[in-house]
Structures are given as C-alpha cells and as structure tokens.
C-alpha cells in the first residue's frame, strides 16, 4: 500500500474536544520493507546495554514483543503501549476478525536517526507501520492517553489487514476504515456541515497538507461510519476487501457488490444521514 500521512499540526473538525487536541502524526507504511528506500544517514546501532526487549501475551493469546532502543523515554512509552495493547487488539479483532498475525513487534526509538533508519519517518511523525513491526518515534512520548489509543488502534489495523490490502488500494478508504476502528464516535455534523462533508475524498486530498487533508480524513471516516450504521459493520469489511484487497474492483463496482446499491444512491443516503440532528 502507498504511504499515507495525517498532518501533525492540523485539527480534525466535527470530532469534539478529544480529537481537537490531537497534534501527533501517525503514518502507515504497509507493504514497504523495514529499511526505507535510498541511503539513510548513518546511524549507530544501539549497544546491547542500551537496547532491551521483552515479550508479553495479550488476552487473546497473541504475543507482543516490546523493544526499546535505549534512552530515558522509550521504556515509559512502551509501558503505556503495553497497557493500551489489549484494547487495541480487541478493537481490531472485533472489526476484522481473529485471522491476522499472532506476533506483534513494537519498537520505541530513542532518536530521530533511529526512527529514520527503521521506518523512514521524520521528526514530525509519531509512529510508522512496516510489514514487520510498528515503530514509534521519540516524539510519541508527548501523546495523551487518548491520542495513543487512537494511533495504536489505527496502526494495528493496518498491520492486521496488510496481507489483504493491495498496493494500489484507494488509500482514502484504507485510512477511513482504520479510523473507523480507531476513533471514538462523535455527534453527526448536522445539516449545515453535511454538504461539505458528504463528498468522497481522493488520495490526492490526503497528500495535500493543511485543511484539505484534514477534511479528507474526516470525509473518509464519516463515509465508513455511515456504511457501518446503514449496512452493518460486516458490510464495511466486505467493502474493504472488494475495494482494497488483491484483485480489487474499482470503488463504484465494489460498493455495488458489497452493499447491493449504486454508488450514487449510497452518496444520497449518506448526505441525508449526515444531515440528521443527533
């Protein structure tokens, strides 16, 4: 799947106080090798005394390896990740089902150099998911508990779904579904904002820094929420597989097959749904 990002400095409208304060960027790099393309800046390998790892078992029997690459903040961050992991695994499994990797590796880096070497991310990124592991940047320590819960759920969904996600999948839909798994519910935007929200985003919108990207993520999320509310959560999963999986259909055909309705019909119903007063 292509790289996708969420701006660190943008605010997500319509989500209430919890997400209004979200400042940390979460990135998904499914399908990429663990080492980024090109030659990263030289970075020293952590020594055996600096690096440490431990393995835990979550409630469903999956194992989680928590790996610290040294520094004073990585272990406290991993403690927080450990406390949030059961909830994240349960949220992903509730939506996706139990058939996804049983072994999860989470790495906390101590420097921007380490993060770039492992995941290709910059200093404005909190986490990255490669085909093998979820990597947290040093800046992730600034996340609130609510933000960490959202980022971990979001990244873990991408990790769980990576084998069923094509490289050319519509990224706006993969991100919308990941946010459906990760983000808490919020009141409907109402009639005044419905016309602005009820437009399907494009992948190009996700790549446009600023309000365009913020609105694109909101639109994708609201669309997935509508599909789950109107057609059922299993139908949203079917839509993901038909629109984003290997040998996927285009979005219009996938909607018709997964939801049993024409895309235009679905969009009209979506606008009406958004216009409701909660």
Regions found by a protein language model. Name each.
Residues 129-133, 146-151, 164-278:
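Acidic/His/Gly-enriched intrinsically disordered linker/tail segments
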Residues 36-50, 106-112, 132-138, 177-184, ...:
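Short, mixed-charge, low-aromatic patches
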Residues 32-34, 93-98, 221:
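Short, surface-exposed loop and linker segments with low hydrophobicity and enrichment for Pro/Ser/Thr
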Residues 52-170, 188-189, 248-251:
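Juxtacatalytic substrate-recognition/specificity segment
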Residues 1-59, 278:
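N-terminal low-structure segments adjacent to metalloprotease catalytic domains
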């Amino acid at each position: 799947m292509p790289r996708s990002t969420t701006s660190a400095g943008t605010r997500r409208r319509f989500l209430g106080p919890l997400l209004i304060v979200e400042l940390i960027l979460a990135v998904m790099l499914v399908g990429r090798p663990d080492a980024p393309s090109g030659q990263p800046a030289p970075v020293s390998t952590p020594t055996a005394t600096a690096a440490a790892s431990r393995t835990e078992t979550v409630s469903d029997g999956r194992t989680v390896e928590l790996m610290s690459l040294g520094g004073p903040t990585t272990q406290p961050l991993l403690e927080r990740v450990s406390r949030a992991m059961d909830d994240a695994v349960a949220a992903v499994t509730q939506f996706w089902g139990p058939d996804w990797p049983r072994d999860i590796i989470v790495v906390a880096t101590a420097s921007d150099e380490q993060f770039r070497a492992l995941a290709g991310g910059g200093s404005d990124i909190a986490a990255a998911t490669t085909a093998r592991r979820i990597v947290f940047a040093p800046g992730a320590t600034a996340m609130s508990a609510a933000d960490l819960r959202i980022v971990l759920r979001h990244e873990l969904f991408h990790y769980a779904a990576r084998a069923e996600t094509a490289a050319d999948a519509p990224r706006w839909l993969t991100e919308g579904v990941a946010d459906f798994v990760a983000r808490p519910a919020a009141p409907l935007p109402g009639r005044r904002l419905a016309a602005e929200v009820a437009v399907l985003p494009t992948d190009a919108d996700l790549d446009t820094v600023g309000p365009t990207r913020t609105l694109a993520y909101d639109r994708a999320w609201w669309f997935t929420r509508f599909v789950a509310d109107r057609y059922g959560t299993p139908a949203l999963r079917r839509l993901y597989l038909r629109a984003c999986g290997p040998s996927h259909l285009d979005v219009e055909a996938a909607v018709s097959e997964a939801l049993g309705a024409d895309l235009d019909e679905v969009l009209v119903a979506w606008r009406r749904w958004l216009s409701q007063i909660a």
